[in-house]
């Protein structure tokens, strides 16, 4: 399987996606379901396909994805990052174009931890003057 497939790992928030691509007809399988079945929202589906449309490869590759952790938005971002890395593994000449679009860079924003004595990461208890 590894011989004909190109691989990329994508991460976003607490989601991790393992992406395998090979030449094909444009089918995208995420955790055993089509991308439309797995991601209900159209925006999440578009996010997953952005690197393919940018490089004019929307119908050129079959993609198999295993993704876990996080929610729908984070998983879609992880899939996009993984697809980008797999495309670069397939053809390094695509890297400048994908990099200019900002798809190569890992979005490092994570949830800030809750602090002791506070309601959340920054929300404090209501102050009473009297």
Swiss-Prot record:
State the UniProt keywords alphabetically.
Ribonucleoprotein, Ribosomal protein
The cross-references to Gene3D superfamilies, in alphabetical order and at most eight, read:
3.30.230.10
Keyword check for Ribosomal protein: yes
Q: Name one GO biological process term.
A: translation
This protein's record includes keyword Ribonucleoprotein: yes
User: Which cellular component terms (GO) are annotated to the entry?
Assistant: cytosolic small ribosomal subunit
Q: Write down the NCBIfam families for this protein, in alphabetical order.
A: PRK00132.1
User: Under what name is this protein listed?
Assistant: Small ribosomal subunit protein uS9
Protein's gene:
rpsI
């Amino acid at each position: 399987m590894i011989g004909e497939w190109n691989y990329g790992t994508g991460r976003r928030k607490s989601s991790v996606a393992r992406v395998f691509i090979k030449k094909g007809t444009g089918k995208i399988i995420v955790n055993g379901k089509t991308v439309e079945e797995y991601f209900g929202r159209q925006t999440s589906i578009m996010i997953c396909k952005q690197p393919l449309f940018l490089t004019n490869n929307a119908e050129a590759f079959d993609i198999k994805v295993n993704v876990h952790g996080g929610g729908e938005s984070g998983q879609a971002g992880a899939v996009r990052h993984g697809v980008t890395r797999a495309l670069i593994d397939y053809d390094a000449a695509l890297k400048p174009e994908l990099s200019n679009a900002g798809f190569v860079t890992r979005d490092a924003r994570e949830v800030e931890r809750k602090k002791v004595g506070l309601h959340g990461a920054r929300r404090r208890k209501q102050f009473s003057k009297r």
